[in-house]
Amino acid sequence: MGCVQCKDKEATKLTDDRDASISQGAGYRYGADPTPQHYPSFGVTAIPNYNNFHAPVGQGVTVFGGVNTSSHTGTLRTRGGTGVTLFVALYDYEARTEDDLSFRKGERFQILNSTEGDWWDARSLTTGGSGYIPSNYVAPVDSIQAEDWYFGKLGRKDAERQLLSTGNPRGTYLIRESETTKGAFSLSIRDWDDEKGDHVKHYKIRKLDSGGYYITTRAQFDTLQQLVQHYSDRAAGLCCRLVVPCHKGMPRLADLSVKTKDVWEIPRESLQLIKRLGNGQFGEVWMGTWNGTTKVAVKTLKPGTMSPESFLEEAQIMKKLRHDKLVQLYAVVSEEPIYIVTEYMSKGSLLDFLKDGEGRALKLPNLVDMAAQVAAGMAYIERMNYIHRDLRSANILVGDNLVCKIADFGLARLIEDNEYTARQGAKFPIKWTAPEAALYGRFTIKSDVWSFGILLTELVTKGRVPYPGMNNREVLEQVERGYRMPCPQDCPASLHELMLQCWKKDPEERPTFEYLQAFLEDYFTATEPQYQPGDNL
């Protein structure tokens, strides 16, 4: 089974030098592609290794979120003798413009130019076609990134969310980078028993100094692939054998296309509004398509809502905010009526989802998990020194599998309507706003924390308006006098205590979103071990 005792000295090794930052990724070296000679060169002569970005040919650099290409994994030799790393498609992709390339999972590519960041100029070695491809849809041939079971930088909580999605059987699994141990991995498996029902168990995969991998020292392997094969054949002490890799959803693209990456103000006629999803004080939200190919959400703002110049300036910042729990801004039409084009979320706003949708049947564990997702997105906004200013369930969007994402961050600052800018006018969300922000305009990340506490009440009451029976003026007066909402029905006291922490009078005494995320993610698991003991296997 490829045990380390009989391993070849030249076996692939995992590098120890790993950067902990989000941008760097795994930092692996790969063995050679066993079949490079089968691919035609299409008459290419002396193509330099563009996978090295701007580095001189022959110097290995880190690409693809940490892939080190210095070993020329799966290399194609051109007539000039230069090796070019081959990449393989992880998903199907349909071209959105005439500049990009449609492809199917399993197709192999030669990368011609990777200087565009999220979009690479590539040639398919399957079809011979050329065009731009999204870089997060491919991985180096024969790398662990190319394995269906490898999920990379995925946190424990997100691993559990994915594994516990509807339709995954017992034995569904994935491997991810360990959050706690540099150079190690985690194996996460969906399990079931009479006491817990469906749940996830985590096993730490450790790395030997000699380059192998093990969960228990009694079974050691040259590669992660061999480890997976071993535990697919037999449980061998795990909760169950590995049955099927967890389904990977399509990765989100940061842009509509390579053309909108930098010039992302688009013509209004490129958008088709198909179905109205909602109607608010300042405009409407539509499901639509861009370029006749790509489903998007379009927020249309009533003329006069905000200055087009101010909006465009703020949108430049919003476009750079990228996180799994933030709705991605794709493009804008900045002439009035302003259009804001974002990723489409299938279940609409969290408020509508809780009041009238599937959310009515959700139990506390799901509601707390949704709160944890919002806290994770806000923790990112906190790290980026940004402020939301209008955090409430109406501005949280819901997708498949109860995924929650934050929308409309930063827009509230730009609204010019007098009924809003007065801060105590009819259109201003007094009941969600911290007193120092409502009274004195002091909006900070700590006033967002106050709003998050109000959002928690919306979750546990399935969308009930905060401070029932009180109007805006009464709320402002009572809160200033120290009134706080009592514990909602069926809400645990510990969760209400968290709300009260968010509503501290002194903003600096309120918790950080980093703390709120950790508290909520561990709300039901704080007494359980994070990892199963490997040496007991």
Swiss-Prot record:
Does the record bear Metal-binding in its keywords? yes
* Enzyme Commission identifier(s): 2.7.10.2
Mechanisms controlling activity: Inhibited by phosphorylation of Tyr-531 by leukocyte common antigen and activated by dephosphorylation of this site.
SMART domains cross-referenced by the UniProt entry: SH2, SH3, TyrKc
What PROSITE patterns does the entry give? PROTEIN_KINASE_ATP, PROTEIN_KINASE_DOM, PROTEIN_KINASE_TYR, SH2, SH3
Q: Which UniProt keywords apply?
A: ATP-binding, Developmental protein, Kinase, Lipoprotein, Manganese, Metal-binding, Myristate, Nucleotide-binding, Palmitate, Phosphoprotein, Proto-oncogene, SH2 domain, SH3 domain, Transferase, Tyrosine-protein kinase
Q: Keyword Manganese, does the record have it? A: yes
Q: Which residues carry this modification: Phosphothreonine?
A: 12
Renumbered to this chain, the positions carrying a covalent lipid of the kind S-palmitoyl cysteine are 3, 6
Looking up Pfam families in the UniProt record yields: PK_Tyr_Ser-Thr, SH2, SH3_1
Q: Where is the lipid attached (N-myristoyl glycine)?
A: 2
Cofactor needs = Mn(2+)
At the top of the EC hierarchy, this enzyme's class is transferase
Query: Which catalytic residues are annotated?
Result: 390 (proton acceptor)
Please give the Gene Ontology molecular function terms for this protein. ATP binding; metal ion binding; non-membrane spanning protein tyrosine kinase activity
Q: Tell me which residues make up the SH3 domain.
A: 82-143
* Positions of the Protein kinase domain: 271-524
Tell me which residues make up the SH2 domain.
149-246
Positions bearing Phosphotyrosine = 420, 531
Protein name in UniProt = Tyrosine-protein kinase Fyn
Native species of this protein? Xiphophorus hellerii (Green swordtail)
What taxonomic lineage is listed for the species of origin?
Eukaryota, Metazoa, Chordata, Craniata, Vertebrata
| Underlying gene | fyn
